Amino acid sequence: MLLARLAQVSREVAATSARSRKTVLLAELFREAEAADVPVVIPYLAGRLPQGRIGVGWKVLSRRVPPADAPTLTVRDVDARLTRLGAVSGAGSQAERTRLVGELMGAATEDEQRFLIGLLTGEVRQGALDAAAVEGLAAATDAPPADVRRAVMLAGSLQTVAEALLADGPGALDRFRLTVGQPVLPMLAHSASSVAEAVGKLGAAAVEEKLDGIRVQVHRDGGTVRIYTRTLDDITDRLPEVTEAALALPGERFILDGEAISLDADGRPRSFQETAGRVGSRTDVATAARAVPVSAVFFDVLSVDGRDLLDLPLTERHAELARLVPEPLRVRRTLVHGPEDTGAAEEFLARTLARGHEGVVVKGLDAAYSAGRRGASWLKVKPVHTLDLVVLAAEWGHGRRTGKLSNLHLGARTADGSFAMLGKTFKGMTDALLTWQTERLKELAVEEHGWGVTVRPELVVEIAYDGLQRSTRYPAGVTLRFARVVRYREDKRPEDADTVDTLLAAHPGVAP
């Protein structure tokens, strides 16, 4: 397949909001693709490189290269060139990358150059890999859409299913089954602003503790246990406690969904950072298990004794879970009948927060398990933390944000009145906010650098974040998890900003 064709479809998909039109465009593309093209076509449509990062920055891409007159590049040719680029290292690597990028761009037409620059800077975003892609693939291969959807769910990958369908036709779907030892992507939750909102949407529901641990999918086949993360990485050897817990259960063949969490001496959850350290690739497992022991807590069951339970309602899966897993290893939950029980749900949330957990997940009782999707029947509710911080510096953006000051350096007040940096963020900014922010920060600039500007610490910004973790990278000794801009607070002075001490007091146990 020519890159020009893929670039054209990507552009047309991005230009329409109609799912039906996206489906038609993607069906046409899949009909033209060969099975061998799929490992490149699918990631490129998603704006992702199969190679991951390849060390090519905006400075190299900004160099003007005369485009080719006619399209000749195939997607597989581009993939091979980018693989060579990613392998460049050592002395002279920057010059070699520049040369290889120049060769690639010189072989590309103007439209292809635009697509490649967007791909390499992360600016290809058209939401192609959603229901429209599944329906397009089904239409292209004369396969039932529901069967393709289920195969993608079980395979955890549209790419895997597309390769099979394009190579072998609809009969290939029979090979995609829920199987012990083959992980599936977990079901995820949407967010709700409150318990009342969640219960109002779902009606009869289970309200469960939301644990801030390591999401684990545990597979047991007789005496063999495998443990997978939410991204399907095998971490069996790093969590022997979870293996031991699974082997102690009465069932012989099952798949469980849950969390591995670590509690301190007072029975409160340790920080996510500490718990997540248990699965580091360089972790000494025995030493880590003594320092940060983990426990398995399960909240769902996907398969028992060869029976696929994904399509059963939550109430029936809960019953199966209770038969298999003893209460101490099951997540705490309460049941509500509808909005009239909102008070009980809010009380459960309050008790959950008091125990140190991060919130609750409200789950519709009649809902099936939608592997690999954010199901509308699971709604997570957790308090949103916000801070008033001061902008200390800002970095120039890349790609679509070129020429705009984008990545903010954030600081909190210290005891002596200075500001300690505790993180960066470029999230939560609209185009209008970026434009305003750039002009305002230019006015406050005291020093210019190649990467951006240092500014007078006068501008207060309200930041939302999901949690706090220790960090040796920043002077404050801690950093924010998933920080994003809510709004600027020009009504506040720098001395009104939150302090490092206040932040640490709000998150006991995370002090550096």
Swiss-Prot record:
GO biological process: cell division; DNA biosynthetic process; DNA recombination; DNA repair; DNA replication
First-tier enzyme category under EC: ligase
Alphabetical keyword list: ATP-binding, Cell cycle, Cell division, DNA damage, DNA recombination, DNA repair, DNA replication, Ligase, Magnesium, Metal-binding, Nucleotide-binding
UniProt: ATP binding residues: E208, R215, R230, E259, F299, R374, K380
Enzyme Commission number, as recorded: 6.5.1.1
Reaction(s) this enzyme catalyzes, per UniProt: ATP + (deoxyribonucleotide)n-3'-hydroxyl + 5'-phospho-(deoxyribonucleotide)m = (deoxyribonucleotide)n+m + AMP + diphosphate
Superkingdom of the source species: Bacteria
A GO molecular function held by the record: DNA ligase (ATP) activity
NCBIfam families assigned: dnl1, PRK03180.1
Family of the protein in this entry: Belongs to the ATP-dependent DNA ligase family.
Name the UniProt record assigns to this protein: Probable DNA ligase
Gene: lig
